[in-house]
Amino acid sequence: MAMLFVLPSCAQNNKPMAKIYDYKALNNKGVEVDFSQYEGKVLLIVNTASKCGFTPQYDGLEALYQKYKDKGLVVIGFPCDQFAHQEPGSDEEIAEFCRLNHGVTFPLMAKTDVNGANESPVFTYLKAAAPTEEYKGFKAKATRTMLKGISKSVEKDSDILWNFTKFLISKDGSTVKRFAPVAEPASFEKDIEAML
């Protein structure tokens, strides 16, 4: 018996022809979200955690959302428990934590795997579109090496190393930039402004 597998064609630059708008994911209330509703918006997609050293970045993400949401920015948080079990709560507990401690009003999705056999197709796409983040300077490069050493879910070079990896997607979905967990949200505000 022969089996036929059809794979999506790739552009000459080895990036997938698909765009973020071709994907769906469950939000934190269990409702399917069709990302096609975000076409024409700048998206900032982040894998998040409530018990991480980078958790205070929720404040910076919310500040960006409040400043630019009327200009077309949508921040979307994907809670993830793959990195040292720093997101142990239920979807409801995570949402309450984010609201009470960080004033989060941007959309939160259901707890999601971002690496491995059960990773969300959204993150499979994002990692293919932007396979590595930029680490500038010795301290940042040392952080990358350390994170890669302790991240048990990392199997491929494109895998996410830790919580608060950020993906910035242009209005037409053609450009995807990836920012390291150590990158504070305000540090790439000019990139957001350029896309709006």
Cite the ranges covered by each PLM segment:
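Bacterial Sec-dependent N-terminal signal peptides
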Residues: 1-17
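N-terminal "domain-start" segment that seeds a small globular fold
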Residues: 12-36
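Short loop/turn microsegments at loop-to-beta-strand junctions
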Residues: 20-21, 43, 163-165
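Conserved helix-turn-beta segment immediately C-terminal to the redox Cys motif
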Residues: 39-42, 50-51, 55-79, 98-102
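Thiol-based oxidoreductase modules, predominantly thioredoxin-like and allied folds used
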Residues: 72-89, 104-116
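Thiol/selenol-based redox catalytic cores and closely related redox-interacting motifs
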Residues: 103-182
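Non-catalytic, surface beta->alpha helical segment in thiol-disulfide oxidoreductase systems
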Residues: 177-196
